[in-house]
Amino acid sequence: MAASAEIDAEIQQQLTNEVKLFNRWSFDDVSVTDISLVDYIGVQPSKHATFVPHTAGRYSVKRFRKAQCPIVERLTNSLMMHGRNNGKKLMAVRIVKHAMEIIHLLSDLNPIQVIIDAIVNSGPREDATRIGSAGVVRRQAVDISPLRRVNQAIFLLTTGAREAAFRNIKTIAECLADELINAAKGSSNSYAIKKKDEIERVAKANR
């Protein structure tokens, strides 16, 4: 009897100790489907679980350290673009929180999983770079590293949401939710997916 009481107490302790994003979304049941991006999308419950996407970490001090930043925080930071939004982290956190609530209402899935799927689907795998010095310049197709795929995906997703919300009756949180849901499905309604296909098409032409 004492043993079962101890087990119950242990389970209760685990439940109370679990860190959930905005006290709602669990990190335990999320996974990264693309094996090459596992090390670059920070969602491990032991390392990256936070109540709010604001860790105040110094991720830009050293090269590649930003790969250790929780992925939801990277999305939040990327929303603080265009001069008038610089440094408004509280606003960015609020946008992400509302977008996650909308995603949960529309898709009934864990919004953290939707964000991960959107990033996996939106990162281009091939790009064209300029080769040659002054005079003759040609473009050559190159593979993209996993970290740059994640960086590009986050940039394209937030850019798409920002452009959709500009001069629109919809709030940016609604636009971000739509963008993430469409990108997670791989739908061409997503700005990020369209841009990714365009980048890969140009690269294919320059192989």
UniProtKB/Swiss-Prot annotation:
PROSITE patterns reported for this sequence: RIBOSOMAL_S7
A Gene Ontology molecular function term of the record: structural constituent of ribosome
Residues with PTM N-acetylalanine: 2
Lineage: Eukaryota, Viridiplantae, Streptophyta, Embryophyta, Tracheophyta
GO cellular component terms, A-Z: chloroplast; cytosolic ribosome; cytosolic small ribosomal subunit; endoplasmic reticulum; plant-type cell wall; plant-type vacuole; plasmodesma
Organs and tissues of expression: Expressed in epidermal cells of root tips, lateral root primordia, root hairs and shoot primordia.
Chain segments annotated as transmembrane: none
Protein source organism: Arabidopsis thaliana
Name this protein carries in UniProt: Small ribosomal subunit protein uS7z
Single Gene Ontology BP annotation: translation
Family, as annotated: Belongs to the universal ribosomal protein uS7 family.
SUPFAM superfamilies (alphabetical): Ribosomal protein S7
Entry keywords, A to Z: Acetylation, Ribonucleoprotein, Ribosomal protein
UniProt-listed Pfam families: Ribosomal_S7
InterPro entries xrefs: Ribosomal_uS7 (IPR000235), Ribosomal_uS7_CS (IPR020606), Ribosomal_uS7_dom (IPR023798), Ribosomal_uS7_dom_sf (IPR036823), Ribosomal_uS7_euk/arc (IPR005716)
